[in-house]
């Protein structure tokens, strides 16, 4: 895994990724091909915080790094306004689930995805575009934007906990049991000091309780 700590480092730091370890929004996960164990594919997750306002940066980044799959959070654009044409010109198929001003998730891929799912199967939180998935080369890629929760006293904190519980139920259901899963996104959760760039400043933050 390659990590730049949100752009703090000029050169990405290489970190060994272990099963269930926490991924930060701009981490680059390197997937080794099982046939020969030599070549690798890039799967990247990025909280873009408005895709239209970051479009020039996004296109430059795609041209430079050329990931196989890019998962975006906080696209903040309605479905009919998603910039799919520009991304197609850059060589990427786009799959998106959005809304005006807030939230929004998307998956960009060099190869077409199949069985695209938007939102929860049980229609939980259907007014918020926070979950999308699709099948890529026999793997279900799940892209999620978890609520931030503000603070433990906020009415939004129980919403975050419920969302995480619903997400666990979703991926544990029979409809997700047939294929390997890679779940990425912005979880608004940091599990240990290695998951934040300033542990002292972040201590006690709603997303960081070591």
Per-region residue spans from a language model:
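N-terminal, active-site-proximal structural segment of metallo-dependent hydrolase catalytic domains
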Residues: 1-105
């Amino acid at each position: 895994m390659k990590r730049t700590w949100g752009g703090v480092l000029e050169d990405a730091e290489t970190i060994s990724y272990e099963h269930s370890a926490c991924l930060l929004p701009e981490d680059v996960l390197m997937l080794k091909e099982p046939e020969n164990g030599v070549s690798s594919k890039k799967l990247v997750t990025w909280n873009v915080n408005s895709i239209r306002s970051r479009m020039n940066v996004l296109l430059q980044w795609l041209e430079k790094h050329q990931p196989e799959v890019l998962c975006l959070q906080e696209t903040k654009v309605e479905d009919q306004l998603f910039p799919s044409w520009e991304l197609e010109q850059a060589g990427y198929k786009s799959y998106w689930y959005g809304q005006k001003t807030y939230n929004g998730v998307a998956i960009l891929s060099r190869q077409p995805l199949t069985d695209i799912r938007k939102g929860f199967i049980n229609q939980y939180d259907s007014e918020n575009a926070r979950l999308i998935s699709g099948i890529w080369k026999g793997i279900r890629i799940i892209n999620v934007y978890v609520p931030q929760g503000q603070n433990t006293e906020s009415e939004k904190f129980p919403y975050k906990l419920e969302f995480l519980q619903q997400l666990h139920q979703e991926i544990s259901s029979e409809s997700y049991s047939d294929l390997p899963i890679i779940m990425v996104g912005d979880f608004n959760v940091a599990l240990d000091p290695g998951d934040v760039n300033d542990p002292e400043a972040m201590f006690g933050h709603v997303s960081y309780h070591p």
